[in-house]
Amino acid sequence: ILILILLFVFNGCIPPSLNKDKWSQDTLDKLTLREKIAQMMIYRMNLRMKDIPVEKWEEILELIDKDGIGGLHFWYGEASTSLTMLNTMQTRSKVPILVDADIEHGLHQRFPEGTEVPPFMAIAASGRPENAYEVGKIVAKESRAVGIHWNFSPVVDVNNNPNNPIINVRSFSEDPSVVSLYATQYILGLQDNGLLATAKHFPGHGDTETDSHSS
């Protein structure tokens, strides 16, 4: 599955003379069992040089050199060092590393240099579905510029419980039809500009009264 996702994300990196399906199968066939298992692993890390001890950075590079890593969950970064670190990792990797991040409120949520966008409920409150598309477009263009391929967003929970402490304004609305309309436009804004989307969370999460991160 991960190889197929990489095929979608890195489509522009494959020479036109190569068949995309053939590239995917050839890449998979060349991997050892350990390397295939490694492709199923996602490594979470900050990509700020100040947060990474030398020994941790060397450990990551050793993982890439030995068996590879399938994905990298991007926590926090900065323009001055993150791109250099990502380029180093991608260059050393036998298979392109799929980089993901949880970006609901714009790239600013992970990169101080990024654009901060309104919560989803505020976007829906504008009454203009095209605004959701434009926000998705902004998020996608900025994310791709810093090497991110996959966004863990949007939130498609229906906020039908006013006592919900964790979904609230992260949802587009308490109306399922509004959530569907605006989430679809946001997803199209991401995908049309080269960023994978994730519709989350669990069914019914909008009707809870506890924080799922701590309960």
Roles of regions detected by a PLM:
Residues 1-9:
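Sec-dependent N-terminal signal peptides
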Residues 190-199:
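Phosphate/pyrophosphate-binding betaalpha-module
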Residues 9, 151, 198:
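Conserved Rossmann-like nucleotide-binding pocket used by diverse enzymes
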Residues 8-22:
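Bacterial Sec-dependent signal peptides at the C-terminal "C-region" and cleavage site
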Residues 46-182, 201, 206-215:
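Enzymes and membrane/adaptor proteins characterized by extended Gly/Ser/Thr/Asp/Glu-rich
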Residues 18-48:
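Mature N-terminal segment immediately following signal peptide/propeptide cleavage
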